[in-house]
């Protein structure tokens, strides 16, 4: 019985590891559509022509990006057998206490805390939450002569490079996670 439970936990970690790649590829896909919409469907055209398409893919991008991180926490919980219900795995006091109880000494744990408190992750999380309620993910179009000339974040950063930066940060994080988890247990992509 104990061996079966252990096998289920290992399987869960591999399942979640596959999900990380799935969500990351999903974010990458949505970014490719965002790039195409901004470049080909919005710039130089009347505003709102492709606004819905952009919003759908922005929502998908942010949901998949945050899901990549959430699945990484699932993998950590499974890899270290933290005995947390899968629907209760989140970076909170219970998770950190379980890591402490299991005497997990891995630099990944500190890195998870750094990511959670980082500006880029908080930005992605805020955008993911905001776009659900029709805040267009803090995006604005600069219009001149009735045509869109640029699509930017409200902080004036161009939309596509901003999304590319977030995706790059997430890739760096989960590659670090893959390298620091117990050898042979996890392969994300």
Model feature map: region roles:
Residues 68:
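Short, positively charged
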Residues 1-39, 45-63, 71-189:
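Acidic, Ser/Thr/Gly/Pro-rich intrinsically disordered interaction regions
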């Amino acid at each position: 019985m104990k061996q079966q439970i252990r096998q289920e936990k290992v399987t869960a970690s591999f399942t979640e590891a596959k999900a990380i790649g799935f969500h990351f590829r999903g974010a990458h896909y949505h970014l490719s559509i965002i790039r195409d919409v901004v470049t080909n469907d919005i710039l130089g055209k009347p505003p709102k022509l492709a606004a819905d398409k952009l919003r759908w893919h922005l929502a998908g991008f942010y949901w998949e990006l945050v899901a990549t991180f959430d699945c990484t926490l699932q993998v950590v919980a499974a890899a270290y057998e933290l005995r947390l219900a899968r629907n209760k795995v989140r970076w909170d006091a219970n998770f950190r206490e379980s890591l402490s109880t299991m005497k997990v000494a891995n630099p990944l744990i500190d890195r998870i805390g750094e990511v959670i408190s980082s500006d880029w992750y908080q930005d992605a999380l805020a955008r993911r939450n905001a776009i659900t309620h029709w805040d267009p993910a803090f995006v604005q179009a600069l219009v001149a002569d009735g045509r869109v000339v640029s699509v930017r974040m409200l902080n004036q950063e161009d939309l596509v490079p901003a999304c590319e930066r977030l995706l790059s940060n997430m890739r760096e994080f989960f590659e670090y996670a893959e390298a620091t988890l117990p050898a042979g247990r996890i392969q994300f992509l």
